[in-house]
Regions:
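Surface beta-strand/loop "capping" patches
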Residues: 54, 59-60, 65, 112-131, ...
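Feature representing long, continuous alpha-helical segments
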Residues: 31, 62, 72-75, 85, ...
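Sequence/structural segment immediately N-terminal to covalent heme-attachment motifs in c-type
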Residues: 58-80
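C-terminal capping alpha-helices of c-type cytochrome domains
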Residues: 32, 36-40, 129-131, 135-141, ...
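Gly/Gly-Pro-rich "capping" loops immediately C-terminal to redox-active cysteine motifs
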Residues: 83-108, 121-165
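Small beta-barrel nucleic-acid-binding modules, principally OB-folds
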Residues: 31-53, 102-125
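Post-cleavage N-terminal segment of exported redox proteins
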Residues: 1-59, 80, 190-199
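Sec/Tat-exported extracytoplasmic proteins
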Residues: 71-72, 78, 107-111, 179, ...
């Protein structure tokens, strides 16, 4: 927190520690974190409840499933059991991989922990065209980039003037602006139900 106060911390790192520091059990430290690293604002323009408060909320998985496919726009980039678009990781079994706290952190701060092979790259072509997305595949001669709209774009490597990996996730970091705290709780509750099918 001292580094934050002195403005000596990278924005990506600050985002990564915001939720954990707001959730610490020591009141003085949590209050200081709330001042220096406030939680994002929700769809009703109110500060989001603390992570501890969100974890205590009861979610409705059925409503969460509807939100996942509509208002939350999650299905625009994630596949669940064959439904949705494959831009980000497949979430069909995410409930067996992440607990509720980690799910909240992944939604609120997607850049804090980007899954391997889902790093965002910015590609600048010699024509001046700029394309941002995830590397879908590459050969010695060609590179295929999948953009946030799930469209694939393939270029000859000889056309690429510059390519840089970004520290920012392609996933929007402001989903809480379209989801209320209860909506978030519902989506997380739905995600916890996504587990491998019994054999």
């Amino acid at each position: 927190l001292k580094l934050v106060e002195e403005k000596r911390i990278e924005p990506d790192l600050a985002a990564a520690v915001t939720v954990p520091l707001n959730a610490v059990p020591w009141r003085d430290l949590a209050n200081q974190a709330a001042t220096l690293l406030p939680l994002p604002v929700s769809s009703d323009d109110q500060p989001l409840p603390s992570l501890g408060s969100l974890l205590k909320m009861r979610g409705n998985a059925a409503n969460g499933q509807k939100l996942f496919a509509s208002t939350g726009t999650c299905a625009n980039c994630h596949v669940v059991r064959g439904q949705g678009k494959e831009v980000g990781p497949d979430l069909s079994e995410i409930g067996a991989k992440l607990g509720r706290e980690a799910l909240y952190e992944s939604i609120l701060y997607p850049s804090a922990g980007i899954s391997h092979n889902y790093e965002t790259h910015v590609v600048i072509l010699d024509s001046g065209t700029v394309v941002t997305g995830i590397i879908a595949s590459q050969t010695d001669d060609e590179l295929s980039i999948k953009a946030a709209d799930a469209l694939m774009r393939t270029f000859k490597k000889s056309e690429i003037e510059q390519m840089e990996k970004q520290n920012v996730s392609i996933m929007p970091a402001d989903l809480q602006k379209v989801l209320s705290p209860q909506d978030l709780a519902d989506v997380v509750e739905y995600l916890t139900t996504l587990r491998p099918s019994p054999k």
